[in-house]
Amino acid sequence: RRTDIAEPAPAGAAAWSSNSTESITLRCGVSLPLQYTTLSHTTDAAGSTWLRVVDATPGANLETWYSVNRHPAVAVTTTRAALGSHANPVDDLGESMSDLSTVAVNPHPAPLATLESAGTEDRCDALLSALPNTLGDFTRLDAASVTASGLPAASAAWTAEGQEPVVLRCGVAPAPGYAPGAQLQQVNDIPWFEDTTLANGTTSSTWFALDREAEIAVSMPQSAGNAVIVGISSAISEHLPRA
C-alpha cells in the first residue's frame, strides 16, 4: 500500500510498503546513472525501457530500475523481498509512465572504450581466442556485440543481468596513473595495477596487467569476485608472452 514519506519529502517521490523489509520507492526527475552504457541489458515493461541496477554492497538487497527512454527519468527502488514472484517492480506503472515524454537517450560509452591504444593489438589474437566464455556469473558476448558497443579491436566483454560489465582491452597504452613503486597485486604470475585515476563514479575498477608484450586493461565491478581476475590471469599467463 502507498505510504507517506517523512518530511521534507523530495519532489516527485512516492513510496509503498507492506512491512519494514518490503518496500518500493519511486523518484521522478532523476539523472540516469553512469552504469547505463552501450553494453547494458535493458528490459521493456509498462510501455517503457528500463535499466536494472543491483546494489553490489555486501549484504544489500536493493535494486533500482531506471526508465531510460522517458523524460523526466524515473527510478524505482525495491527490496528483493518486496518483489516476491514478480519479475520487476514497474509493471503496474504503464498508465502513469504514458504521461511522460518518450525520448531517445544515448548511453554512456562502454568501459575502457576511450583508453588510448599502444598499437600492439596484433599481439593479442591468441589471448582473445583463449579467454573463457564465462567468468563467475558473467557471460562473454560475441564479437559482433562487442563491436556494436563501440569497443575497438582486441576487446572482449562479459555481462550479467543487473551488474556492470567486465571489459578487457589488449594493446592499450600504459596505465595513466602508474609510477615505479606503485602498489601491485599479484595473481598467479601476473602483477596487476589498479588505476584509481580512472574511477568514474561507478562501482567498477580498472586494472592493468603489467610485464607482457601487450598491455592489458580490465574494467570490472568490485563485486565480481576472484573468479574474474583469476580466469583472465590464467589466460594471460598461457597466451601472452612476457615483455
Features from the language model and the residues they span:
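Residue-level marker of positions within ordered structural domains that often coincide
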Residues: 33, 81, 129, 136, ...
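A short, solvent-exposed beta-edge/loop patch
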Residues: 49-110, 198-243
